[in-house]
């Protein structure tokens, strides 16, 4: 690894943390690289409900422990992801002993035990938790996503979850996290939800803007308006899952073996503009996490087109800095 390449996180030391989503295999193969460029890590999947709590009386913390131990040993922050989500939650959470629907009381008891155990295990080691993930509906005529959490617990499940997480670790920053967060309609739904939670006294310390964007959109104005709207609630903002796909969402092509020159140039300019904007709001934005480490691995290789390579980050498939890296480095 070239020593002449400056550390990405060090170059933003006066602005915000620079993070990456990781899994345990990466720590073994890319640990030195991760430690050089990132001062925050998020478990991409290995802290999700079904990963750490597959059966009611069984917890599997080996992978999560490995990530936390790696980070703590190197002075790297950890974001916890995620406690309450409609995906990757095991069926037993919503069922009683006979396979019927669990009662509200049973679910609240289970949720508290889960949060107490998971958050409590990493107390004072995880600086922020995505407590509730993606509870807002994308369709314009609905507000809350229709999930088992909502159907069985009612809307106050969010308040309950935040209160439980705060009890388990009073020092952790607690976030509501969502995608399409720059869309004006969904933006207002997220704003109103978090404002309502705050009005109810819920310990919500921040909003997670996922940042699954592409080289064409959303517009810089939409990103700026979302930042300003959320910041007006006087909460911290984290960009939690940043990647810039080289494809529009509706683009189904599968024939590219590398990005076109136009894609690469658009991505460089977008990264430069976006990080300039983030830096402008560094009093509000305290952490920016990429949803991966480098182009050698990204969830976008299988979404929305399965098996299609994507190149969404500032490091290439060989862990070398792309031109976009040099566009955003040294902006502090």
UniProtKB/Swiss-Prot annotation:
Subcellular location: Cytoplasm
Main localization of the protein described in the UniProt heading: cytoplasm
EC code: 3.2.1.8
Family: Belongs to the glycosyl hydrolase 10 (cellulase F) family. Cytoplasmic xylanase subfamily.
Annotated thermal dependence: Optimum temperature is 50 degrees Celsius. Loses 100% activity after incubation for 15 minutes at 50 degrees Celsius.
Pathway(s) it belongs to: Glycan degradation; xylan degradation
Activity regulation remarks: Completely inhibited by Ag(2+), Cu(2+), Hg(2+), Mn(2+), Pb(2+) and Sn(2+). Strongly inhibited by Fe(2+) and Zn(2+). Co(2+) and Ni(2+) cause little inhibition while Ca(2+) and Mg(2+) do not affect enzyme activity, and Ba(2+) produces a small stimulating effect. Irreversibly inactivated by SDS in vitro.
pH dependence: Optimum pH is 5.5. Shows more than 75% of maximum activity from pH 5 to 10. Is still active at pH 12.
GO CC field: cytoplasm
Catalytic site: 134 (proton donor), 241 (nucleophile)
Keyword Coiled coil part of the UniProt annotation: no
Classification of source organism: Bacteria, Bacillati, Bacillota, Bacilli, Bacillales
Pfam family, one: Glyco_hydro_10
UniProt keyword Cytoplasm, yes or no: yes
Catalytic activity reported: Endohydrolysis of (1->4)-beta-D-xylosidic linkages in xylans
Function summary: Plays a role in plant xylan biodegradation, probably via the hydrolysis of short xylooligosaccharides resulting from extracellular xylan hydrolysis, once they have been transported inside cells. Shows similar activity on xylans of different rate of arabinose or methylglucuronic substitution. Also displays high activity on aryl-xylosides. Is active on xylotetraose and xylotriose, but does not hydrolyze xylobiose, indicating that XynB is a xylanase and not a beta-xylosidase.
UniProt KW keywords: Carbohydrate metabolism, Cytoplasm, Glycosidase, Hydrolase, Polysaccharide degradation, Xylan degradation
PROSITE patterns: GH10_2
Domain GH10: from-to ranges: 2-331
UniProt-recorded name of the protein: Endo-1,4-beta-xylanase B
Any single GO BP term: xylan catabolic process
Superkingdom of origin: Bacteria
GO molecular-function term, one example from the UniProt record: endo-1,4-beta-xylanase activity
EC class: hydrolase
Encoding gene per record: xynB
């Amino acid at each position: 690894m070239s020593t002449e390449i400056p550390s990405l996180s060090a170059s933003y030391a006066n602005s915000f943390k620079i993070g990456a989503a990781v899994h345990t295999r990466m720590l073994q193969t890319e640990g030195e690289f991760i430690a050089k460029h990132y001062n925050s890590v998020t478990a991409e999947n290995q802290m999700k409900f079904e990963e750490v709590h597959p059966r009611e009386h069984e917890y599997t913390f080996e992978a999560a422990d490995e990530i936390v131990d790696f980070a703590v040993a190197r002075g790297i922050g950890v974001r916890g992801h995620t406690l309450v989500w409609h995906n990757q939650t095991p069926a037993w959470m919503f069922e009683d002993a006979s396979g019927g629907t669990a009662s509200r009381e049973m679910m609240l008891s289970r949720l508290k035990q889960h949060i107490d155990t998971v958050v409590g295990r990493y107390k004072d080691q995880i600086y922020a938790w995505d407590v509730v993930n993606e509870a807002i509906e994308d369709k314009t005529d609905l507000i809350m996503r229709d999930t088992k959490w909502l159907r069985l617990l009612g809307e106050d499940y969010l308040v309950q979850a935040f209160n439980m997480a705060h009890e388990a670790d009073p020092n952790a920053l607690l976030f509501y996290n969502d995608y399409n967060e720059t869309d004006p309609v969904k933006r207002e739904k997220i704003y109103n939800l978090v404002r309502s939670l705050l009005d109810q006294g819920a310990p919500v310390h921040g909003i997670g803007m996922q940042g699954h964007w592409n080289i064409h959109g959303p517009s810089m104005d939409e990103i700026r308006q979302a930042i300003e709207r959320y910041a007006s609630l006087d909460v911290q903002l984290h960009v939690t899952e940043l990647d810039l796909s080289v494809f529009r969402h509706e683009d189904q092509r599968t024939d590219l073996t590398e990005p076109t020159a136009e894609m690469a140039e658009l991505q460089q300019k977008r990264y430069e503009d976006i990080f300039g904007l983030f830096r402008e709001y560094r009093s509000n934005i305290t952490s920016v996490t990429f949803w991966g480490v480098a182009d050698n691995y990204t969830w976008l290789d299988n979404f929305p087109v399965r098996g299609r390579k994507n190149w969404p980050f500032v490091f290439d498939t060989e862990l070398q800095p792309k031109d976009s890296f040099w566009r955003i480095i040294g902006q502090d």
